[in-house]
């Protein structure tokens, strides 16, 4: 049996762009992705602190050090530029093994 546990969390990511007519996904600055141990095409849950919306999508690598956080496709309707997001990924693990330590990145404090 496997269970889902928190693997990575980017807190207080500010939406910098949105592209309704793109095929889908969330674009994240590749340096932020590296800090959070999130890879391209990884499934993530996106939680919008401004309106309570939650959605699942996959990650596209953005330009390094651009601070890009952009929702694309239909997900663009669920945010506004300037909204604050939590971006969360999970891992499937065997509960009888040692727990993984999640990678937490807080963009508000820089941690």
From Swiss-Prot:
Its main location: cytoplasm. GO terms for cellular component: cytosol. It is found in: Cytoplasm. The keyword Thylakoid does not apply. Substrate binds at residues 57, 73-75. SUPFAM superfamilies: ADC-like (SSF50692). It is an enzyme of class 4 (lyase). Its EC number is 4.1.1.11. It catalyses: L-aspartate + H(+) = beta-alanine + CO2. Its cofactor is pyruvate. CDD domains: Asp_decarbox. Pathway: Cofactor biosynthesis; (R)-pantothenate biosynthesis; beta-alanine from L-aspartate: step 1/1. Binds 1 pyruvoyl group covalently per subunit. Keywords: Autocatalytic cleavage, Cytoplasm, Decarboxylase, Lyase, Pantothenate biosynthesis, Pyruvate, Schiff base, Zymogen. InterPro entries: Asp_de-COase-like_dom_sf, Asp_decarbox. The modification Pyruvic acid (Ser) is found at residue 25. GO terms for biological process: alanine biosynthetic process; pantothenate biosynthetic process. GO terms for molecular function: aspartate 1-decarboxylase activity. Is synthesized initially as an inactive proenzyme, which is activated by self-cleavage at a specific serine bond to produce a beta-subunit with a hydroxyl group at its C-terminus and an alpha-subunit with a pyruvoyl group at its N-terminus. The active site is at 25 (schiff-base intermediate with substrate), 58 (proton donor). Catalyzes the pyruvoyl-dependent decarboxylation of aspartate to produce beta-alanine. Heterooctamer of four alpha and four beta subunits. Belongs to the PanD family. This is Aspartate 1-decarboxylase.
């Amino acid at each position: 049996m496997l269970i889902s546990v928190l693997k990575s969390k980017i807190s207080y990511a500010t939406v910098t762009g949105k592209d309704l007519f793109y095929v889908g996904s969330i674009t994240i600055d590749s340096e932020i992705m590296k800090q959070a141990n999130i890879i391209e095409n990884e499934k993530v849950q996106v939680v919008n602190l401004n309106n309570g919306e939650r959605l699942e999508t996959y990650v596209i690598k953005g330009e390094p050090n651009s601070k890009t956080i952009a929702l694309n496709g239909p997900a663009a309707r669920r945010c506004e530029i300037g909204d604050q997001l939590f971006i969360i990924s999970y891992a499937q693990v065997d509960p009888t093994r040692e727990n993984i330590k999640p990678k937490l990145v807080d963009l508000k404090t820089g941690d």
